C-alpha cells in the first residue's frame, strides 16, 4: 500500500514541476542552478515582474528567490545589496544564491542587475525537496503510522508559531526544533502543499536512525613509532588530548579506562560496541598490554551517540574536546543533509576540531548512487561532510574489507577519506575482557586515536598551541600510504593512515596557511633537494557549510597548479560518473571543482624550487583560508616496528613493518643477536610489500637488532631489543588485613622482576624483586586491587607485563600469630520472649586468642 501510494504522490510532484514553469523554454545558459532535486535553468531577470508573485506571497514581509550570474558576487556587491534590502541566505552551485528580499520592485531588480545577476526564479516547491523525496527514494523509517516524519527549514527569521494555523489546516504535527529547522509529521499527499508555502525553503526525510557500524593496528598505523620505548625518542601518546566519543550507552567498568574518562554523559548500556571502540582510541593496556589503544595518554568524554556531535558547541570549551569519534550510520548515501551541514559548520565555529566517522559496512549495497551495488554506499549523511574524516576498513595486510563502504559521496566527491585497520581488531570488552571485532566501526577509532597523537605532536612542537582541524585533515590524508589504485580512489580514499610520516611533516614545519579571494592568485615556493624519490603536496581548505538545497556541496572552489620551469601538473581527480568502470578507474590529472582537497604527487621529482599556483577560481563566501602541506620522501627505508627498545618474548611470531618509497628492488630482512656485529638474513620481501613476520630466537638477552635494506638504502632498529619471557601462573597466596602475598612461575634466566599495581590511571611499578613471590603492604583489605609482574633481562630491561590479576576485597588464608576471635556469645541467649524489652539488655561474649 505505502509503496504504491508514494509512487502516485511523486508522479504528482513531477507533473506539478512541469506545470509550474517550463524552465527549458526560458533558458538563460549563464543562469543554471544545481539543486538536490535537479538542475534548473533560471528565467532571465529581465522578465521578472510583480505579476510573478503568486497569491500566497503577496502579503509576505519577505520574498525568497534564487538568483544566478556568470560569476560569484563579491563581498562589496553584497554590501550594496544588503543596503537595498537583499540578504544572502546561502550559496548554490553554480554561481547562484538563495536570497530574501524586503521588497520586490523595479529598484530591487535594478540593484541585482547592477551586480551582474542574470537569472532569477521563485524558489519553486520542487526546488525545496531533498534528493530522496524528489527521486521517490523514500526510506521506510520515515513512516510514523500513516504520516511521514520530515525535517523542514524556513527563512532565517521564521517564527514557526506564526505557521500554526497553516500547519493545522494541513494536519501537520509539530514535533520540535532540530538544527536550523523543525521536525514534523505530515501526510504524504500534503507535502507539496507544504512546499508551496513561501516561507518554507527546504524539506527532507528525517535523519536516518543510528546503527552501530589493536595489536596489529598500532603497528600498521605507525602509532607505535610515535611513542617509542627508548629514551630520547618521540613520545606522542595523546597526552592532554580529549576525544568526544558517542556510542551505544554506558561504557562499562574496565581498568584500561581507569581515571581517564572525564565525563560519562550516556544512558544505560546497550551493548559492548562503545567499550570496544573506546579501547581502540585510548585503552591503556592495564589489563593486557596487547590491548593498548592508539593514544593511551588521551582522555575521553563519553556520550550516547549523537550527543558527542550535538553537544560540541558547549563541550569544545568545557572539556577541551578536539577530536570526536562516531562509528554509527546516518542513512546510506543520504546526501548532504541538515546534519551534514551541521558538522561542516562545527569545523568553522571550532577551528581546532576534527570529526571522525566510520565510512560504513555497506560495501556490497546499492544505495541509489546510480552505479548499482558496490559503489556510492557511504552510510551518511554527516560522514559525507567536506570538513570531516570518513574511514574505510582494511585488513592487517592492507586489503580493503569486502564490507567496507565505497564512495563517492552523493555529488561525486572523494569518500572515504582514509583507511585504517578495522578487521579483527583486538580491544576492550566489559567487564575487564577483550575481543576481536571487525568493521569500519573499529577503523574509525584507529584514526581518532592517531589524530590524538598528532594533536599531541603539534602541541609539543608549537609551544602547546592547538592546530587547526583543516591542517590535521591535510596532514593525515597527504601522508597516508597509497593503496589500491594509484592516487586517491573511492575504496581506500587517500590510503592507509601513516601517523609517523604525518608527525614528521609537523616536526619539519612542512605546511603553510594563507587566504585567497575571488580571482586572486597566490604562489608558494616548495624547494625539493636532489635525490628525492617522491614529492607530495596537498591543498586543503575548511569549506563553508553548504546550503542544504544545493546539488553540489562545494562552496568555495580553489584550483591549484604545480610548476617547475616549463613543466606543469594538475591535481589528481577521480571520475564520479555513475558506472562501475568509471568509478574504478585510476585518477587523472585535471581541474577539480568538486573537492576541498587537491593532491599532487610526483615520483622521482627533479630538484628545484617548485611553484604551487593557487587560484581563487570561485570564492562566493570569502576570503577563504587554506592550508598547503607537503612531504618529501627520500630513497630510504625505515623500520617502524620493531623500532628499537622493545623487549620481546622468545619464540614468538612478531610483525615487522617498514616505510619506503616505490621501487623495483626486493627488501632484505636480517637480524643480529650480538648487537649488530653480524647479521643473518631471515626473509626477503617483494618491492610492493611493507610488512613481514619473524619468530624471535630462544633465550634471554639485550642485543637483538633488525636490519632492512634495498639496494644501497638500509636501516637498523634505533636501539637494541631485549628478549625475555613473561611470568605465568600468577597466584594470590594469602590476604590479611594490611597485606597480601602473590607468586608466579619463574622466568628462565630473568635477572629479576618488576611488580605492578593499578594506580589512578595506569599500572604503576611499585617494586623490584629477585624472588618469584612478593608481599604488598599497607593495603586496605576492603579494596579491589589489580596487580601484575614483568621479568627483567640480564641488562635490566623490563619485559612484557603479564595479564593483570584482580585481588578482590576480603581476607584469604591469613595466618596470624595474634588473632582475636569471638568464640561464643554468652548473653543474650537465642531464646528471647517477644514481650521482653531489649533496649537495655546486657551483651556478653567470650574472646580468645586464635593465633
Task: Locate predicted features.
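Pro/Thr/Ser/Gly-rich low-complexity, intrinsically disordered linker/stalk tracts
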Residues: 722-748, 781, 796-813
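Hydrolase catalytic cores
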Residues: 280, 419-486, 612
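Catalytic-core environment of secreted peptidases
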Residues: 246-259, 393-445
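Beta-strand-rich modules
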Residues: 776-796
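Subtilisin-like serine protease catalytic core
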Residues: 161, 226-309, 319-322, 333-336, ...
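Substrate-binding/access-modulating region of protease and related hydrolase catalytic domains
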Residues: 157-162, 189, 238-239, 284-289, ...
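C-terminal subdomain of the subtilisin-like protease fold in secreted/lumenal serine endopeptidases
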Residues: 291, 302, 456-532, 550, ...
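Autoinhibitory N-terminal propeptides
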Residues: 18-236, 240-243
Amino acid at each position: 500500500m505505502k509503496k504504491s501510494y508514494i509512487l502516485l504522490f511523486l508522479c504528482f510532484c513531477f507533473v506539478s514541476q512541469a506545470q509550474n514553469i517550463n524552465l527549458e523554454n526560458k533558458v538563460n545558459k549563464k543562469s543554471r542552478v544545481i539543486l538536490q532535486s535537479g538542475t534548473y535553468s533560471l528565467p532571465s531577470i529581465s522578465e521578472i515582474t510583480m505579476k510573478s508573485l503568486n497569491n500566497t506571497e503577496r502579503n509576505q514581509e519577505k520574498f525568497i528567490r534564487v538568483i544566478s550570474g556568470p560569476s560569484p558576487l563579491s563581498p562589496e556587491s553584497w554590501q550594496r545589496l544588503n543596503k537595498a534590502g537583499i540578504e544572502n541566505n546561502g550559496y548554490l552551485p553554480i554561481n547562484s544564491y538563495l536570497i530574501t528580499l524586503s521588497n520586490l520592485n523595479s529598484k530591487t531588480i535594478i540593484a541585482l542587475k547592477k551586480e551582474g545577476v542574470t537569472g532569477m526564479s521563485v524558489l519553486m516547491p520542487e526546488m525545496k525537496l531533498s534528493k530522496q523525496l524528489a527521486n521517490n527514494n523514500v526510506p521506510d523509517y520515515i513512516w510514523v503510522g500513516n504520516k511521514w516524519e520530515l525535517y523542514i527549514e524556513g527563512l532565517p527569521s521564521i517564527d514557526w508559531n506564526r505557521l500554526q494555523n497553516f500547519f493545522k489546516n494541513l494536519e501537520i504535527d509539530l514535533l520540535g526544533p532540530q538544527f536550523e529547522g523543525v521536525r514534523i509529521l505530515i501526510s504524504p499527499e500534503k507535502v507539496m502543499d507544504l512546499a508551496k508555502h513561501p516561507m518554507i525553503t527546504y524539506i527532507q526525510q528525517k535523519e536516518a536512525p543510528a546503527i552501530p557500524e589493536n595489536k596489529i593496528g598500532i603497528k600498521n598505523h605507525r602509532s607505535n613509532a610515535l611513542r617509542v620505548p627508548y629514551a630520547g625518542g618521540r613520545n606522542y601518546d595523546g597526552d592532554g588530548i580529549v576525544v568526544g566519543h558517542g556510542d551505544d550507552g554506558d561504557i562499562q567498568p574496565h581498568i584500561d579506562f581507569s581515571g581517564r574518562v572525564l565525563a560519562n554523559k550516556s544512558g544505560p548500556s546497550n551493548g559492548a560496541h562503545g567499550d570496544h571502540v573506546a579501547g581502540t582510541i585510548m585503552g591503556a593496556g592495564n589489563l593486557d598490554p596487547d590491548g593498548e589503544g592508539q593514544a593511551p595518554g588521551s582522555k575521553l568524554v563519553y556520550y550516547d551517540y549523537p550527543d558527542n556531535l550535538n553537544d560540541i558547541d558547549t563541550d569544545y570549551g568545557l572539556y577541551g574536546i578536539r577530536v570526536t569519534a562516531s562509528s554509527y550510520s546516518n542513512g546510506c548515501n543520504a546526501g548532504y543533509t541538515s546534519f551534514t551541514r551541521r558538522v561542516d559548520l562545527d569545523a568553522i565555529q571550532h577551528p581546532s576540531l576534527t570529526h571522525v566517522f566510520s565510512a560504513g559496512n555497506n560495501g556490497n549495497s546499492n544505495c541509489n548512487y546510480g552505479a548499482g551495488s558496490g559503489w556510492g554506499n557511504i552510510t551518511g549523511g554527516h560522514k559525507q561532510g567536506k570538513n570531516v574524516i570518513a574511514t574505510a576498513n582494511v585488513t592487517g595486510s592492507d586489503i580493503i574489507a569486502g564490507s567496507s563502504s565505497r564512495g563517492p559521496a552523493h555529488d561525486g566527491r572523494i569518500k572515504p577519506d582514509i583507511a585504517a585497520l578495522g578487521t579483527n581488531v583486538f580491544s576492550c570488552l566489559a567487564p575487564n575482557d577483550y575481543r576481536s571485532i571487525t568493521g569500519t566501526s573499529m577503523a574509525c577509532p584507529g584514526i581518532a586515536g592517531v589524530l590524538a597523537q598528532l594533536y599531541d605532536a603539534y602541541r609539543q612542537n608549537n609551544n602547546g598551541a592547538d592546530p587547526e582541524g583543516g591542517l590535521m585533515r591535510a596532514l593525515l590524508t597527504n601522508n597516508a600510504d597509497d593503496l589500491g589504485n594509484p592516487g586517491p580512489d573511492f575504496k581506500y580514499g587517500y590510503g592507509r593512515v601513516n601517523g609517523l610520516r604525518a608527525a614528521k611533516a609537523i616536526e619539519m614545519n612542512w605546511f603553510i596557511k594563507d587566504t585567497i579571494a575571488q580571482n586572486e592568485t597566490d604562489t608558494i615556493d616548495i624547494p625539493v633537494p636532489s635525490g628525492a624519490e617522491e614529492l607530495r603536496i596537498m591543498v586543503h581548505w575548511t569549506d563553508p557549510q553548504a546550503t542544504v538545497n544545493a546539488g553540489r556541496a562545494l562552496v568555495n572552489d580553489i584550483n591549484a597548479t604545480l610548476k617547475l620551469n616549463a613543466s606543469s601538473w594538475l591535481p589528481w581527480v577521480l571520475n564520479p560518473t555513475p558506472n562501475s568502470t568509471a568509478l574504478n578507474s585510476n585518477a587523472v590529472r585535471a581541474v577539480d571543482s568538486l573537492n576541498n582537497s587537491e593532491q599532487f604527487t610526483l615520483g622521482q621529482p627533479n630538484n628545484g624550487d617548485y611553484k604551487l599556483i593557487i587560484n581563487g577560481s570561485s570564492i562566493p563566501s570569502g576570503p577563504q583560508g587554506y592550508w598547503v602541506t607537503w612531504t618529501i620522501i627520500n630513497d630510504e627505508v625505515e623500520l617502524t616496528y620493531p623500532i628499537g627498545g622493545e623487549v620481546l618474548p622468545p619464540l614468538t611470531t612478531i610483525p615487522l613493518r617498514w616505510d619506503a618509497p616505490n621501487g623495483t628492488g626486493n627488501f632484505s630482512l636480517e637480524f643480529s643477536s650480538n648487537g649488530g656485529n653480524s647479521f643473518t638474513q631471515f626473509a626477503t620481501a617483494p618491492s610492493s610489500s611493507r610488512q613481514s613476520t619473524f619468530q624471535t630466537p630462544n633465550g634471554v638477552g639485550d642485543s637483538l637488532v633488525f636490519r632492512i635494506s634495498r639496494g644501497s638504502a638500509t636501516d637498523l632498529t634505533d636501539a637494541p631489543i631485549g628478549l625475555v619471557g613473561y611470568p605465568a601462573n600468577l597466584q594470590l597466596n594469602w590476604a590479611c588485613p594490611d597485606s597480601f602475598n602473590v607468586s608466579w612461575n619463574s622466568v628462565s634466566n630473568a635477572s629479576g622482576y618488576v611488580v605492578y599495581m593499578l594506580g589512578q590511571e595506569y599500572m604503576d611499578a611499585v617494586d623490584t624483586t629477585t624472588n618469584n613471590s612478593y608481599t604488598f603492604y599497607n593495603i586496605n583489605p576492603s579494596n579491589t586491587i589489580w596487580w601484575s609482574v614483568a621479568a627483567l633481562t640480564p641488562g635490566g630491561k623490563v619485559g612484557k607485563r603479564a595479564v593483570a590479576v584482580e585481588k578482590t576485597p576480603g581476607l584469604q588464608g591469613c595466618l596470624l600469630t595474634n588473632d582475636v576471635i569471638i568464640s561464643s556469645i554468652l548473653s543474650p541467649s537465642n531464646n528471647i520472649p517477644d514481650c521482653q524489652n531489649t533496649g537495655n539488655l546486657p551483651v556478653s561474649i567470650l574472646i580468645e586468642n586464635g593465633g
